[in-house]
């Protein structure tokens, strides 16, 4: 079991590392490539587009050919794309490398969740996904610090050499440590539980959890996207104050994420999901009424706590009905989360909604819709929480 957890954590970490590692070098990259920082900020959207593209195909391929091949290829693509970025001499080549980085990270991301669905029952899966969320929160704090230390002595290309090395490590783990987890077949007693209706992507329960997780990701990405404007322009924080504040909010996310597995031993998953949405609603009301920086910071802290306590549980429930199609389900969740959150941020920008109102709107909208879905759509107990998976290969 340890090998699956190690490999899943490593596969997921490529995604946030690809976002946060290079940001500290953005001014120098822009200067060397004769591009403005504003032009290179599109690299974030290009990276997400690459992830979404990979997710369109990676899940189905993982269900048909296995998790291990997709993990290896994804890591290889991420490694190669990182080298391409390091060799870029102009903006378009750099953006091409960023797109391919997203493709590699997206494939690995999908496989990681499919592996956890294959190997863990629902109760343990919810705990592990909460821990995974906590570990993922460490990356936005450590990656810029690591990038800063690297750039004290080396050029910006070294940031992408480091990411390439991460791709190599993940590839080696996938090649030599990871065992195939794709179910070869189900026992006769489980066939009815994994019928096409039970594993349909338009299953009412799956759609409800897809909506909840997509709205939750939209909340946290809106917070990340709006935070520079809120903290530095509206609240008057310096860059140093901004960095410290974001580190503290990430710390809150880590503490709550690492505490959630213990809370699952005391409370039902639905209770934690309701607490999560209650925190979102409270945060939205707090921010709408805030007149001081202290109250605003308290509202932002509630956002991090709310996401951390409920997201892993909701993801676990969403993947629960799928044994033979875990890859496709994971892909669908990833695509919806990436595209849904990007669509909201884009629409809000087009409509000229301020950063604060953008955040308040998604907080209140997410909480109301999600609470209604949690109460109205409950898990189908006829679907097994976990099936015993006979592995196709042990290599």
From Swiss-Prot:
Alphabetized SUPFAM superfamilies for the sequence: MFS general substrate transporter
Keyword Membrane present in the record's keywords: the answer is yes
Asked if the keyword Chaperone belongs to this entry, the reply reads no
Membrane topology reported for the UniProt record: Multi-pass membrane protein
Any single GO CC term annotated in Swiss-Prot or TrEMBL for this entry? plasma membrane
Q: Which family does it belong to?
A: Belongs to the major facilitator superfamily. DHA1 family. MdtL (TC 2.A.1.2.22) subfamily.
Q: What is this protein called?
A: Multidrug resistance protein MdtL
TM ranges are 4-24, 42-62, 69-89, 93-113, 131-151, 158-178, 217-237, 247-267, 271-291, 295-315, 328-350, 355-377
Primary subcellular site in the record, as a coarse category:
membrane
One Gene Ontology term of the molecular function aspect: transmembrane transporter activity
Q: Which InterPro entries match?
A: MFS, MFS_dom, MFS_trans_sf, Multidrug-R_MdtL
Subcellular localization: Cell inner membrane
PROSITE patterns (alphabetical): MFS (PS50850)
């Amino acid at each position: 079991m340890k090998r699956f957890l190690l490999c899943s954590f490593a596969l997921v970490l490529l995604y946030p590392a690809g976002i946060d590692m290079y940001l500290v070098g953005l001014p120098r990259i822009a200067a060397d490539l004769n591009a403005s920082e504003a032009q290179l900020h599109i690299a974030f959207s290009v990276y997400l587009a690459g992830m979404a593209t990979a997710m369109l195909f990676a899940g189905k391929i993982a269900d048909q050919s296995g998790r291990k091949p997709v993990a290896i290829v994804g890591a290889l693509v991420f490694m190669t794309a990182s080298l391409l970025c390091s060799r870029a001499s102009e903006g378009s080549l750099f953006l091409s490398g960023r797109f391919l980085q997203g493709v590699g990270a997206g494939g690995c991301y999908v496989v990681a969740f499919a592996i956890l669905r294959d190997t863990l029952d629902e109760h343990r899966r919810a705990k592990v996904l909460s821990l995974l969320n906590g570990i993922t929160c460490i990356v936005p704090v450590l990656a810029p610090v690591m990038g800063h230390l690297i750039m004290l002595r080396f050029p910006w290309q070294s940031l992408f050499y480091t990411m390439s090395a991460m791709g190599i490590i993940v590839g080696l783990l996938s090649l030599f440590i990871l065992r195939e987890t794709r179910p070869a077949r189900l026992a006769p007693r489980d066939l009815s539980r994994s019928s096409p209706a039970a594993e349909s992507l338009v299953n009412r329960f799956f759609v409800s959890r897809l909506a909840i997780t997509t709205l939750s990701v939209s909340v946290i990405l809106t917070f990340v996207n709006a935070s520079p404007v809120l903290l530095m322009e509206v609240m008057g924080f310096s860059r140093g104050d901004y960095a410290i504040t974001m580190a503290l909010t990430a710390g809150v996310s880590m503490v709550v994420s690492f505490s959630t597995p213990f809370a699952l031993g005391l409370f039902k998953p639905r209770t934690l999901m309701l607490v999560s949405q209650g925190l979102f609603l409270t945060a939205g009301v707090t921010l709408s009424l805030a007149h001081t920086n202290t109250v605003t910071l308290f509202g932002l802290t509630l956002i991090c706590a709310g996401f951390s306590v409920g997201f892993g549980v909701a993801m676990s429930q969403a993947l629960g009905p799928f044994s033979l199609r875990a890859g496709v389900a994971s892909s669908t969740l990833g695509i919806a989360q990436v595209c849904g959150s990007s669509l909201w941020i884009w629409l809000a920008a087009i409509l000229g909604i301020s950063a604060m109102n953008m955040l308040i709107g998604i907080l209140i909208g997410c909480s109301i819709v999600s609470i209604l879905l949690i109460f109205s759509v409950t898990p189908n107990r006829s679907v097994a929480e976990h099936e015993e998976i006979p592995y196709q290969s042990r290599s």
